[in-house]
C-alpha cells in the first residue's frame, strides 16, 4: 500500500493509464482478428477493408508504446503480405 501522497497519486495515475491502454490494446487486437478471419475465409475484399481499419490502430498502438513500434510494423507487413497472397 502506498504511504506518501505522491505514491498514492502515482497509483491512481497507473490505474487510469492501465485502463486506457487495456482498451486500446483490446481494440487493436479486435481489428487484427477481423483481418485474420477474412484471410482465413479467403475473402480478399473483406480483408482489404478490415486492413484499412487495422493498420492505423496498429501504428497508433506502436506510437503510444502499447506495443513496440517495430512489432506494429511487423504485424502490418505480415498481414499485408498474407492479403497479397490471396490475390494469387
Curated annotation (Swiss-Prot):
InterPro entries attached to this UniProt entry: Ribosomal_bS20, Ribosomal_bS20_sf
Function: Binds directly to 16S ribosomal RNA.
GO molecular function, one term: structural constituent of ribosome
Keyword RNA-binding: yes
Origin organism lineage: Bacteria, Pseudomonadati, Pseudomonadota, Alphaproteobacteria, Hyphomicrobiales
GO BP term (any one): translation
Gene3D superfamilies assigned: Ribosomal protein S20
Family according to the record: Belongs to the bacterial ribosomal protein bS20 family.
A single GO cellular-component term on record: cytosol
Disulfide topology: none
The name this protein goes by in its record: Small ribosomal subunit protein bS20
Keywords of this entry: Ribonucleoprotein, Ribosomal protein, RNA-binding, rRNA-binding
Organism: Nitrobacter winogradskyi (strain ATCC 25391 / DSM 10237 / CIP 104748 / NCIMB 11846 / Nb-255)
